[in-house]
């Protein structure tokens, strides 16, 4: 092994080997385990959420592969209708063309060409994360087989009356000219106004005041609503008002939707341009007047003065005309949530248009029952409640989009507008017995991307055909996804899976939080806090990082602020941490919370962990390899039980099996934070810090019996080899690299750690007596080291130790482990005191046993007192500063709560440290000169 751990030298090498050898493909065993990757957009790039999610999925897949399951991790990409079309349209714009210049067929061909040459970047980047997906089965939602499944589902839903075309309100993007899903709408708080307008009563008896944030929509009002029990307006219910700026009158209606205490208690109702008003309009049979064109200009349904104006220009004119007519009561400053398209950034309009819809209520009921009866389990379980709430209030699903890239809707229209639904035109003519000369025109719309991705768990396995893969791997085992798409994707997969296969699409749904920055802020380009996982793996210099963060901003004015913050946070750029360190960090952060705070300091710590494991392996190989090879010549390997293991060996083996039990429980319960913590604690705090140290007095002492050396070497190798298998699902690269040398020494056959059996806890090998004995040794050595640290005694200086009190087992353990204690605690003598008074000494306790280190002659009394005086003076100043802040009521009341809490914690820590120093000062003062 190389002296230094260099992840770049091993990670891409091993991934190439694994993929070439076909280790990622199913092996055809009896017990199957399958995960479907949430298909990333074909336009996408790997972000922290993808990297986190892929770490969890890969850990599960590697674990089950090592458990002997036939594993399939299905990979693929989503065609991402709107996003992909925008990318290609932007390319055309740069050439001075539009998609209409090319025509539909040529444009679609251009998109396919882009996909072949530039799409799929993210799937290549997933390789860098070590994902053991079956690349030979990579799928795309526009593949021929998947397209066949989409057509089949559409036709069957239509034939069963579960799919219809109708005029309903949708989220309309006036730049892209298409309906979009709620997930593609980003609502952000913005400064605006609230306009209060007067609507005169038709009988001339007065007026009603209504307030709106969108005054231009008043031209589409068809009622004013009041609460039925509001005494101010009960006498007006059924009367009419003259709609300002028009020649229409509209009724005053009563509806519980109105909140009497909000504003004037009167609400303008615009059913064609507000989702709540739409419901009110349906309840009361109101007219639906659409006042917008597809590009959000005002249409022929408004007075001529306002026609063809952009909505925001129309707003200004409407407000001016209301004011001129004396019908503008007041204007207030107002903050409101403005819905914008996540790609176009335009304000989204609720828009009444003909669309295709799925009737979801009949599909939702079985999907609710599947979770209620335990066929599907959400982890954590608290997501059940949110799932049920969404599903019991489900609305029909708008599945049509007014773009060209996607699965074209398999519906045809004759000249009279009659609809014929079938996978192809030929099949439509056969199905409906249409004459060959009847002209048919296919619906120009395409299906919502979520429609095809709802079929992902079974369409990728060959449905509607009854394939061997479908039989082997469906239902799949678990879905790993974020909480933000439970409704958009998870619920729809459950509905579609049950409807078309009769079975649930997966048995468990592991819902994880969203990766945020160290302050808990969402990572976004505009905030300048985005971290690219590949930059953490391979490193990036400062100038490249600045260019990356400031390029392509929606708001270029933010560039200077982002550059300044980036230079401050990363003055040297970002160093290379390697993939394993990033994966370990993600695992340790995989708690049950909604937010995953990513702190760069954590990944540095886990890079050090990988380095620790590497150095431990080098120590083992240097001290063990040649001797074990010699021992093996012509001899079968000795079993542990024949080696007469000592307490240190029985202790580390016990701790390994306890850790294995903890790790397996963690994986089975999706507590990867506990898995990583258990592996970390055992590796660093037990195997490296203690067992390796306990091995040195045996291996480095020529007088040690050969049997003791043999059992030590055997244990070093076998525990390390098993530890590598235990940690492999989380940190696959470093474990493979080390295992290639350690595995054969431990008698393991095979070409890769990936296909080795996962360790199983052997409870009969947990030796509580050995655990208690070595824990005593650790406490003993730690006590001596603590005194050294407190009294500023050099770590390597041999010192005498006095013992007092204690029990019989303390003497027994001392006798059994004296060579370890003397070596690890650097003791030149150990002496039991009887009843005599000990000399001035620093003391530590191991249960009732007193450890005493006489200080006379060990330290320079005067120099040490001066050092302590300086340190105490510094601490008292620090404490006074903190206490002064906390005594200031203005500071405590106005400073952020987390800052005040940190200062209080600081005060406690400094007080405790000062108390310790004062005690040390007193002990040293009492020493004889």
Curated annotation (Swiss-Prot):
The places in or outside the cell where this protein is found are: Cytoplasm
The cellular component terms of Gene Ontology attached to this UniProt record, alphabetical and capped at eight, are: cytosol
Main localization, broad class: cytoplasm
Question: One MF term from GO for this chain?
Answer: valine-tRNA ligase activity
Motif 'KMSKS' region per UniProt: ranges? 522-526
Sequence positions that bind ATP: 525
Coiled-coil region list: 855-926
State the Gene Ontology BP annotations: valyl-tRNA aminoacylation
Q: From the UniProt annotation, give the residues forming the signal peptide.
A: none
**What is this enzyme's catalytic activity, as reactions?**
tRNA(Val) + L-valine + ATP = L-valyl-tRNA(Val) + AMP + diphosphate
* Top enzyme class: ligase
* Pfam families listed in its UniProt record: Anticodon_1 (PF08264), tRNA-synt_1 (PF00133), Val_tRNA-synt_C (PF10458)
Motif position, 'HIGH' region: 40-50
* Key words, A-Z: Aminoacyl-tRNA synthetase, ATP-binding, Coiled coil, Cytoplasm, Ligase, Nucleotide-binding, Protein biosynthesis
Tell me which EC number(s) this protein carries: 6.1.1.9
Record note on quaternary structure: Monomer.
What does the UniProt record say this protein does?
Catalyzes the attachment of valine to tRNA(Val). As ValRS can inadvertently accommodate and process structurally similar amino acids such as threonine, to avoid such errors, it has a 'posttransfer' editing activity that hydrolyzes mischarged Thr-tRNA(Val) in a tRNA-dependent manner.
- Family assignment from sequence similarity: Belongs to the class-I aminoacyl-tRNA synthetase family. ValS type 1 subfamily.
Quote the record's domain comment: ValRS has two distinct active sites: one for aminoacylation and one for editing. The misactivated threonine is translocated from the active site to the editing site.
Q: What is this protein called?
A: Valine--tRNA ligase
């Amino acid at each position: 092994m190389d002296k230094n751990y260099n992840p770049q030298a091993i990670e891409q090498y091993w991934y190439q080997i694994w993929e070439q050898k076909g280790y990622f493909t199913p092996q055809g065993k009896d017990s199957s385990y399958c995960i479907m990757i949430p298909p990333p957009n074909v336009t996408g790039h790997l972000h922290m959420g993808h990297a986190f999610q892929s770490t969890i999925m890969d850990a599960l897949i590697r674990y089950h592969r090592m458990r002997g399951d036939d594993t399939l991790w299905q990979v693929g990409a989503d065609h991402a209708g709107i996003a992909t079309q925008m990318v290609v349209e932007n390319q055309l714009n740069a050439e001075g063309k539009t998609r209409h210049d090319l025509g539909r067929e040529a444009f679609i061909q251009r998109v396919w060409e882009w996909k072949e040459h530039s799409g799929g970047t993210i799937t290549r980047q997933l390789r860098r994360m070590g994902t053991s997906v079956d690349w030979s089965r990579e799928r795309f939602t526009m593949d021929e087989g998947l397209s066949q499944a989409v057509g089949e589902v559409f036709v069957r839903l239509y034939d069963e009356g579960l799919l219809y075309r109708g005029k309903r309100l949708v989220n309309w993007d006036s730049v892209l000219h298409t309906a979009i899903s709620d997930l593609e709408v980003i609502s952000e708080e913005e400064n605006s106004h609230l306009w209060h307008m007067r609507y005169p009563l038709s009988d001339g008896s007065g007026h009603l005041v209504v307030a709106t944030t969108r005054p231009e929509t008043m031209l589409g009002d068809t009622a004013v609503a009041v609460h039925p029990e509001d005494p101010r307006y009960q006498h007006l219910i059924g009367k009419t008002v003259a709609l300002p700026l028009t020649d229409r009158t509209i009724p005053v209606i009563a509806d519980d939707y109105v909140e009497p205490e909000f504003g004037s208690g009167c609400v303008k109702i615009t059913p064609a341009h507000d989702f709540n008003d739409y419901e009110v309009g349906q309840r009361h049979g109101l007219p639906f007047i659409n006042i917008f064109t597809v590009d959000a200009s005002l249409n022929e349904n408004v007075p001529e003065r306002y026609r063809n104006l952009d909505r925001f220009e129309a707003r200004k004119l409407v407000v001016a005309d209301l004011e001129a007519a004396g019908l503008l009561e007041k204007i207030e400053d107002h903050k409101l949530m403005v819905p914008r398209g996540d790609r176009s950034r335009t304000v989204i309009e609720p828009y009444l248009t003909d669309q295709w819809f799925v009737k979801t209520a009949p599909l939702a009921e079985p999907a609710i029952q599947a979770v209620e009866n335990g066929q599907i389990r959400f982890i954590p379980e608290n997501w059940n409640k949110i799932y049920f709430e969404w599903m019991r209030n489900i609305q029909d699903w708008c599945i049509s989009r007014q773009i060209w890239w996607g699965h074209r809707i398999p519906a045809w229209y004759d000249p009279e507008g009659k609809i014929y639904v079938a996978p192809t035109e030929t099949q439509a003519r056969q199905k409906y017995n249409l004459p060959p000369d009847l002209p048919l025109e296919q619906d120009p719309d395409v299906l919502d991307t979520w429609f095809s991705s709802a079929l992902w768990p079974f369409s990728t396995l060959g449905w509607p055909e009854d394939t061997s893969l479908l039989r082997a791997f469906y239902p799949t085992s678990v879905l790993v996804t974020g909480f933000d798409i439970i409704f958009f994707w998870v619920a729809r997969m459950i509905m579609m899976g049950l409807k078309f296969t009769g079975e649930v699409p997966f048995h468990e749904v592991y819902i994880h939080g969203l990766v945020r920055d160290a302050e808990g802020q969402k990572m976004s380009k505009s905030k300048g806090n985005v971290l690219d996982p590949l930059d953490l793996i391979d490193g990036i210099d400062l100038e490249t990082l600045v260019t990356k963060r400031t390029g392509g901003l929606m708001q270029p004015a933010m560039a200077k602020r982002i550059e300044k913050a980036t230079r401050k946070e990363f003055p040297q750029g970002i160093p290379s941490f390697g993939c394993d360190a990033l994966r370990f960090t993600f695992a340790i952060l995989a708690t049950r919370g909604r937010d995953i705070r990513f702190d760069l300091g954590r990944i540095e710590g886990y890079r050090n962990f990988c380095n620790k494991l590497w150095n431990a392996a080098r120590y083992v190989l240097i001290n063990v390899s040649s001797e074990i090879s010699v021992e093996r010549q012509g001899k079968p390997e000795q079993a542990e039980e024949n080696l007469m293991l000592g307490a240190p060996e029985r202790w580390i083996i016990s701790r390994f099996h306890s850790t294995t039990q903890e790790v397996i429980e963690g994986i089975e319960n999706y507590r990867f934070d506990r898995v990583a913590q258990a592996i970390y604690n055992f590796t660093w705090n037990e195997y490296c810090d203690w067992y390796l140290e306990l091995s040195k007095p045996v291996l480095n002492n020529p007088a040690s019996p050969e049997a003791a050396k043999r059992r030590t070497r055997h244990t070093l190798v076998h525990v390390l080899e098993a530890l590598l298998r235990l940690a492999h699902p989380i940190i696959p690269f470093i474990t493979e690299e080390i295992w290639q040398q350690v595995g054969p020494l431990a008698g393991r056959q095979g070409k890769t750690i990936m296909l080795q059996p996962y360790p199983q806890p052997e409870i009969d090998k947990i030796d509580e007596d050995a655990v208690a004995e070595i824990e005593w040794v650790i406490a003993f050595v730690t006590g001596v080291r603590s005194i050294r640290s407190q009294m500023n005694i050099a770590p390597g200086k041999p010192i005498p130790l006095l013992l007092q009190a204690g029990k019989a087992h303390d003497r027994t353990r001392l006798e059994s482990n004296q060579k370890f204690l003397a070596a690890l605690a650097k003791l030149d003598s150990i002496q039991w005191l009887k009843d005599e008074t000990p000399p001035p000494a620093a003391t530590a306790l191991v249960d009732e046993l007193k450890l005493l280190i006489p200080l006379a002659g060990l330290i320079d009394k005067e120099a040490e007192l001066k050092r302590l005086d300086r340190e105490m003076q510094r601490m008292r100043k620090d404490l006074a500063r903190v206490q002064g802040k906390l005594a200031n009521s203005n500071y405590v009341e106005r400073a952020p709560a987390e800052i005040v809490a940190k200062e209080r914690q600081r005060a406690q820590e400094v007080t405790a440290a000062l108390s310790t120093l004062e005690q040390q000062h007193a002990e040293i003062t009492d020493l004889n000169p």
